[in-house]
Each structure stands twice: as structure tokens, then as C-alpha cells.
Amino acid sequence: MSRTLNEGFTVCQLRLYQEHHILASLFIDPENPDDFVAGYIEALNTRHVILRSVSPFGRYDGFILVRVADVTMAIGEDDYAERLRLLLHYRGEQPTAPFSLREGEDYLHAMCRNAQEGGRVITLWTADNEYVGKVELLDDMRVTIGRLDFFGENPVSETIALRDVEQASFGAEDDCLYEVLSRGSAHLC
């Protein structure tokens, strides 16, 4: 099956999961079957899917953006999804508040814009690096991140082409950890 046909099938499958509010697991590394993300599909187009992420411990965990082309398999309504749904229910978890998505806006751009407007930490992954920090500048082609160190301090400006970003997270527990460290308080997390 060609890559384009496969991506079209994936979009159709994910659209059904979104319409029926099915908790899905998206596998993104064919070499590592344990490399997947789980959650409810918040937004979907032919380029990206945004999940309202659910952690393996049954807690809502921000949002994660994945390129549709990188999804090697999607599974919904399996035992793992049922387990996560039960944990969400028993814990009384409430969904993460949505972020704004403007009409026709690129999803990655929207995620970066929301992080910038709220002064929040975002994580961007390229093929070679992971960038954790606050958005300093954003345009249609690039994002400049104040990349934080291990202690959430000493931001170093790094500019990344949006087309090079393979995944992004916003509002996840890891992002919040850096927000707490950089602010010295947990007021947002």
C-alpha cells in the first residue's frame, strides 16, 4: 500500500475514533512497539492529529501532536483503552481544558501560539533533538524556543523550522514539571 493511501486510511480511521469519542492508541515507531501515545482525538486533518493525552496511569496529560504520516498503527476499543477509561472514571478525572484553534490554522502553529500566549512550556521533537521551553517568537515557518536546562532555568534561544517538528506536547506533566521549576511555583500545574 502506498504511503498516501495508508495516510488516507489512517485519517479515516482516526476520524471515526474522533466522531465516536473512542480512546485510541497511536503507534509511531515501527521498530519499537512500546512507543505509542494514547488519548482522545481533539483535532485531525490530513497532516496532524492532536490527542487529548491520557497517561498510562489513567490521568489526563495535556495534548500531544503527531504527524499523521508517522502513525504506523492506530488501535481503539481494546483492553488497554478500557483500562484507561476505567482509571479516568475511578479517579474522577476531568478532561484537560481545550486550547484555541483558529479556523484554517496549522495545528502545530496553534499549539505553539497557545503556549506563547499563556507563557507556558511546550516540548517539540525533531528527528535529532528534543526542545523544552517557552515560545519566544513564532511565524508561519519557524518557532524560537527559550530552551530550558534540566533545572528549568537559563533559557537559550533556539530556532526550529516548523516543518522539522515531528511531535509536540503542551500541558503534559513533563511540560508542567519545567513550568514549576522555571517559575518556582506550581500555580498552573
Region spans (language model):
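Short glycine-rich, low-complexity segments
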Residues: 1-36, 54-129, 149-189
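Short aromatic-glycine-enriched beta-strand elements
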Residues: 47-52, 142-146
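Residue-level recognition of beta-strand microenvironments
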Residues: 44, 74, 138-140, 168
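N-terminal "domain-start" segment
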Residues: 34, 44-49
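Short beta-strand-centered aromatic/proline hotspots
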Residues: 35-42, 131-137
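Viral structural modules
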Residues: 1-2, 136-139
